[in-house]
């Protein structure tokens, strides 16, 4: 334990030793010594101030309002014994224990201390102090933030965050005490890892530009080719297909020009094929099995508009009946030799004469 060695000149803050982290601070704390070494007035009375917990020790800083010869009181963990948390029925909770004097600490012997937490927090402080003491004994101290004294006051350097987050601390300003003038080596300017951003976080690589505000202007390649005329992959619409109705875009790639096997509609869907002659008025197109009459036949007489079903066209060798003769009876042969022409009956006769045989 040391007396008057870890406080600022104005007694607003504790002077944290180099390499230690501030874990917790409690204000409105009373410190008293029920049992103190004889012959010393430093331990008399009750002192009011603030209590600081670091990685290796507990520091009490007396309030400026108290006219007390003890400005600060430091208790390292390895010199504290028999620490307990007391919870009286009437009064605030407090921590009680025994402290041994440190070499060159400003006093000798041992004393019993009592720390009363007027605004609460004794149990939390005692639990955190026990964890910090155990971690320090194992060589892995708790670290949250490191403090060092500079020309303008106390500065905070962020350290390893093992368990507890730092609280909002007040910065004390004033001239540093003797021995704490210049900042220690390693706690001045933050290390290179906390300075300027690394090279990978500098300017964006070549080819990356800032996006246009609101995407008003389309990027290259998305101009009229996409929203205007069809892209090069789409060919013109085949003949016979009009403009698509609104809402239909250009046809897909696979529906471009028709394949070679699908030509334009043949002429059989338009005008009649060349092999069909002109049919008389009032009659439709002849069935597909009827072909054009031979060369010797003219226009059928009146009343015979079309060739009856089932009949076939006569050969070219057969000739038309002589002039003046009527069309043959439906059951008679279509054409006879001229010498047998006289034997044909008239159309009004019901008798049929058979031709004479020629011997």
Swiss-Prot record:
<feature type="short sequence motif" description="PPxY motif 5">
    <location>
        <begin position="273"/>
        <end position="276"/>
    </location>
</feature>
<feature type="domain" description="GRAM">
    <location>
        <begin position="16"/>
        <end position="87"/>
    </location>
</feature>
<feature type="short sequence motif" description="PPxY motif 4">
    <location>
        <begin position="259"/>
        <end position="262"/>
    </location>
</feature>
<keyword id="KW-0677">Repeat</keyword>
<feature type="compositionally biased region" description="Polar residues">
    <location>
        <begin position="334"/>
        <end position="359"/>
    </location>
</feature>
<feature type="region of interest" description="6 X 7 AA tandem repeat of Y-G-X-P-P-X-G">
    <location>
        <begin position="173"/>
        <end position="303"/>
    </location>
</feature>
<dbReference type="GO" id="GO:0036126">
    <property type="term" value="C:sperm flagellum"/>
</dbReference>
<dbReference type="GO" id="GO:0033011">
    <property type="term" value="C:perinuclear theca"/>
</dbReference>
<dbReference type="Pfam" id="PF02893">
    <property type="entry name" value="GRAM"/>
</dbReference>
<feature type="short sequence motif" description="PPxY motif 1">
    <location>
        <begin position="219"/>
        <end position="222"/>
    </location>
</feature>
<dbReference type="GO" id="GO:0050699">
    <property type="term" value="F:WW domain binding"/>
</dbReference>
<dbReference type="InterPro" id="IPR044852">
    <property type="entry name" value="WBP2-like"/>
</dbReference>
<feature type="repeat" description="5">
    <location>
        <begin position="255"/>
        <end position="261"/>
    </location>
</feature>
<feature type="repeat" description="3">
    <location>
        <begin position="201"/>
        <end position="207"/>
    </location>
</feature>
<dbReference type="InterPro" id="IPR004182">
    <property type="entry name" value="GRAM"/>
</dbReference>
<dbReference type="GO" id="GO:0003713">
    <property type="term" value="F:transcription coactivator activity"/>
</dbReference>
<comment type="function">
    <text>May play a role in meiotic resumption and pronuclear formation, mediated by a WW domain-signaling pathway during fertilization.</text>
</comment>
<feature type="short sequence motif" description="PPxY motif 2">
    <location>
        <begin position="231"/>
        <end position="234"/>
    </location>
</feature>
<feature type="repeat" description="4">
    <location>
        <begin position="241"/>
        <end position="247"/>
    </location>
</feature>
<feature type="repeat" description="2">
    <location>
        <begin position="194"/>
        <end position="200"/>
    </location>
</feature>
<dbReference type="GO" id="GO:0035038">
    <property type="term" value="P:female pronucleus assembly"/>
</dbReference>
<feature type="region of interest" description="Disordered">
    <location>
        <begin position="252"/>
        <end position="359"/>
    </location>
</feature>
<feature type="repeat" description="1">
    <location>
        <begin position="173"/>
        <end position="179"/>
    </location>
</feature>
<dbReference type="GO" id="GO:0007343">
    <property type="term" value="P:egg activation"/>
</dbReference>
<feature type="short sequence motif" description="PPxY motif 3">
    <location>
        <begin position="245"/>
        <end position="248"/>
    </location>
</feature>
<feature type="compositionally biased region" description="Pro residues">
    <location>
        <begin position="252"/>
        <end position="262"/>
    </location>
</feature>
<feature type="repeat" description="6">
    <location>
        <begin position="297"/>
        <end position="303"/>
    </location>
</feature>
<feature type="short sequence motif" description="PPxY motif 6">
    <location>
        <begin position="287"/>
        <end position="290"/>
    </location>
</feature>
<dbReference type="GO" id="GO:0035039">
    <property type="term" value="P:male pronucleus assembly"/>
</dbReference>
<protein>
    <recommendedName>
        <fullName>Postacrosomal sheath WW domain-binding protein</fullName>
    </recommendedName>
</protein>
<dbReference type="GO" id="GO:0061827">
    <property type="term" value="C:sperm head"/>
</dbReference>
């Amino acid at each position: 334990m040391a007396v008057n060695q870890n406080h600022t000149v104005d007694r607003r803050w504790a002077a944290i030793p180099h390499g230690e982290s501030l874990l917790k601070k409690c204000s409105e704390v009373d410190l008293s010594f029920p049992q103190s070494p004889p012959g010393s007035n430093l331990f008399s009375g009750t002192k009011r101030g603030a209590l600081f917990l670091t990685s290796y020790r507990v520091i009490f800083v007396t309030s400026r309002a108290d006219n007390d010869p003890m400005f600060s009181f430091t208790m390292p963990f390895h010199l504290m014994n028999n620490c307990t948390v007391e919870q009286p029925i009437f009064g605030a909770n407090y921590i009680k224990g025994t402290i041994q004097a440190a070499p060159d600490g400003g006093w000798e012997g041992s004393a019993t201390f009592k720390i009363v937490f007027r605004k609460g927090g004794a149990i939390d402080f005692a639990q955190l102090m026990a964890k910090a003491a155990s971690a320090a004994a194992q060589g892995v101290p708790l670290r949250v933030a490191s403090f060092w004294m500079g020309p303008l006051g106390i500065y905070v350097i962020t350290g390893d965050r093992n368990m507890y987050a730092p609280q909002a601390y007040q910065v004390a300003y004033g001239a540093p005490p003797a021995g704490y003038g210049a900042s220690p080596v390693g706690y001045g300017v933050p290390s290179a890892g906390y300075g300027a951003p690394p090279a990978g976080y500098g300017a964006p690589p070549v080819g990356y530009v800032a996006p246009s505000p609101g995407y008003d202007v389309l990027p290259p390649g998305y101009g009229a080719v996409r929203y205007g005329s069809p892209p090069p992959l789409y060919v013109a619409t085949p003949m016979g297909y009009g403009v698509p109705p609104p809402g239909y875009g250009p046809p897909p790639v696979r529906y471009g020009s028709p394949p070679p096997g699908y030509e334009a509609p043949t002429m059989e869907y338009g005008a009649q094929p060349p092999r069909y002659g002109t049919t008389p008025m009032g009659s439709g197109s002849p069935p597909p099995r009827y072909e054009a009459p031979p060369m010797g036949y003219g226009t059928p007489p009146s009343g015979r508009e079309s060739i009856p079903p089932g009949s076939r066209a006569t050969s070219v060798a057969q000739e038309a009946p002589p002039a003046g003769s009527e069309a043959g009876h439906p059951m008679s042969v279509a054409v006879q030799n001229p010498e047998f022409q006289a034997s044909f009956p008239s159309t009004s006769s019901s008798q049929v004469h058979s031709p004479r045989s020629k011997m």
